Amino acid sequence: MSSKSIELPVLGQVLRLNCPEEQHEALKQAARELDLRVSEMKERTGILQLERVLSIVALNLSYELLQAQQKTTSIEALLQHRIQQLDHSLESILTQKVNN
């Protein structure tokens, strides 16, 4: 995986980053999403201080990430439980076949 430089317009500035080329499109999309969220937050709240708006957007993004992680953990636990149930059912069926 080789890194290549990418320029991303973020909040009226250009950030130059090195990252694997296959991540370029995702980073561009993330930069657009950040710009959009900051613009929406400024418009919705009327807050003009960029640092304050960025803090609120960062908090919202962190909250969304935490919610997604909790949902993933819950789904993983549910799937693990279901796999154990299926495994137990298969063992029971195989045991019955061997005993018959």
From Swiss-Prot:
Q: GO CC terms for this protein?
A: cell division site; cell septum; cytosol
Which InterPro entries does the annotation name? Answer: Cell_div_ZapA-like, Cell_div_ZapA-like_sf, Cell_div_ZapA_N
Its subcellular locations are: Cytoplasm
Q: Name one Pfam family in it.
A: ZapA
Coiled-coil spans are 21-45
UniProt main location, coarse: cytoplasm
- Keywords in UniProt for this one? Cell cycle, Cell division, Coiled coil, Cytoplasm, Septation
Question: Which BP terms from GO are recorded?
Answer: division septum assembly; FtsZ-dependent cytokinesis; septin ring assembly
Family as reported in the entry's similarity comment: Belongs to the ZapA family. Type 1 subfamily.
State whether it acts alone or in a complex, and with which partners, per the record.
Homodimer. Interacts with FtsZ.
Q: What does this protein do?
A: Activator of cell division through the inhibition of FtsZ GTPase activity, therefore promoting FtsZ assembly into bundles of protofilaments necessary for the formation of the division Z ring. It is recruited early at mid-cell but it is not essential for cell division.
Name of this protein = Cell division protein ZapA
Source organism: Pasteurella multocida (strain Pm70)
